[in-house]
A protein has these predicted regions:
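Mature extracellular "passenger" or substrate-interacting domains of secreted, surface-exposed proteins
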Residues: 23-163
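Short, threonine-centered small-residue motifs that mark membrane-proximal processing/anchoring sites
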Residues: 1-24, 160-184
C-alpha cells in the first residue's frame, strides 16, 4: 500500500509541474510583417521578469524588397554580400543588404527587417540573439519589422526558450529524490551469511 501511495504522489507531482518552454517557429517576412499587423502567435505565455531566450541563425535571411534589402534577424543594419549559397541565389560578392535605418511603430524604433517580439502590446528588438527578462506579461508574438508587407519575402527559423531550470523542474527533481529515499528507507534489510 505504501508503494502505491508513493507512486501516486510521484505521478501527481509530475502532473502539476510544468516543463521548461522550448520551441521552434518559422517567421515569414510577408505574413508576419509588423506593417500588416499580424505577428506569429507562438502560444507561449510569459510573465514579466520570466527568462526569455530567442535565437535565429545569422545566415538565415529574409528580404524587405528590391536589392539591397536582404538581412538576417538583426535587420538592415549594414552592408551584406551574397555568399553564392544563400537564399538570394545571387553570385558571391553581390551586395544584397545595406543600412536602411530605423522603423518606428507600436512605441518601438528598430532596424527595418529585424526580428521583434511583442508581449502584451509591448515590443522588443530580439535580433539573432536575445536572452533576458520578459518585458511584459502575455503571449509572445514574433514580427518581421517593416512598414509594409507587399514586397517582403523569405522566412527565418526562430528558437524560443524559457527559464531552465524552472522552479517547477527543481520541485520535480527534489520530489523524485524524496520518493527514491522513501522507497529505499522502507526496504527490509537482508541478512547475508557466508559459509
Amino acid at each position: 500500500m505504501r508503494g502505491f501511495t508513493m507512486l501516486a504522489a510521484g505521478a501527481a507531482l509530475i502532473a502539476f509541474c510544468s516543463p521548461a518552454t522550448a520551441a521552434s517557429f518559422v517567421v515569414d517576412a510577408a505574413s508576419n510583417s509588423s506593417g500588416a499587423g499580424f505577428g506569429l502567435n507562438t502560444g507561449l505565455t510569459y510573465f514579466a521578469g520570466d527568462l526569455l531566450t530567442v535565437s535565429a541563425a545569422a545566415d538565415d535571411l529574409w528580404s524587405a524588397g528590391l536589392l539591397p534589402r536582404w538581412s538576417n534577424a538583426n535587420g538592415l543594419i549594414g552592408d551584406l554580400f551574397a555568399t553564392g549559397t544563400d537564399e538570394t541565389g545571387l553570385p558571391a560578392g553581390t551586395q544584397i543588404g545595406a543600412n536602411w535605418g530605423l522603423w518606428a511603430q507600436f512605441g518601438l524604433s528598430a532596424p527595418y527587417g529585424s526580428l521583434v517580439g511583442g508581449i502584451g502590446g509591448v515590443y522588443q528588438l530580439l535580433g539573432t540573439s536575445f536572452s533576458g527578462p520578459a518585458w511584459a506579461s502575455g503571449t509572445l508574438e514574433l514580427f518581421y519589422w517593416d512598414e509594409n508587407s507587399f514586397d517582403n519575402s523569405g522566412r527565418i527559423s526562430v528558437n524560443v526558450g524559457g527559464a531552465v531550470p524552472e522552479p517547477a523542474s527543481w520541485a520535480m527533481m527534489l520530489g523524485g529524490f524524496g520518493l527514491v529515499g522513501g522507497a529505499l528507507r522502507s526496504r527490509r534489510k537482508l541478512a547475508v551469511s557466508f559459509g
